[in-house]
A protein has these predicted regions:
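Conserved long alpha-helical elements within nucleotide-processing catalytic cores of c-di-GMP signaling
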Residues: 11-34, 41-68, 78-82
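Glycine-rich ATP-lid/hinge loop adjacent to the conserved G-boxes
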Residues: 74-76
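Amphipathic HAMP/coiled-coil signal-transducing linker helices
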Residues: 1-10, 24
């Protein structure tokens, strides 16, 4: 599957394939590639204190918020792993 089971957004495997494809296109066409990666500050502390159910909900909410903010056809939102997007 190309989707993350928890958040429903693109998973790391699909992200890696997409980045490879975009990188090759950028080299071929001499165009830039932009990449933003982030994690959730203090997520481990939150997850440990509030529980995994709350942590999962947090990850889902972040995925939804970021997906809602990205609207260009060539953009991709992916969960890289853990709390990294």
């Amino acid at each position: 599957s190309c989707l993350d089971g928890l958040t429903g957004i693109t998973n790391r495997r699909q992200f890696d394939d997409f980045l490879d494809q975009e990188w090759r296109r950028a080299v071929r066409e001499s165009t830039p590639v932009s990449l933003i990666m982030f994690d959730i500050d203090r997520f481990k502390t939150y997850n440990d204190s509030k529980g995994h159910t709350a942590g999962d909900e947090c990850l889902k909410q972040v995925a939804t918020a970021v997906t809602g903010a990205v609207n260009r056809p060539g953009d991709l939102v992916a969960r890289y792993g853990g709390d990294e997007f």
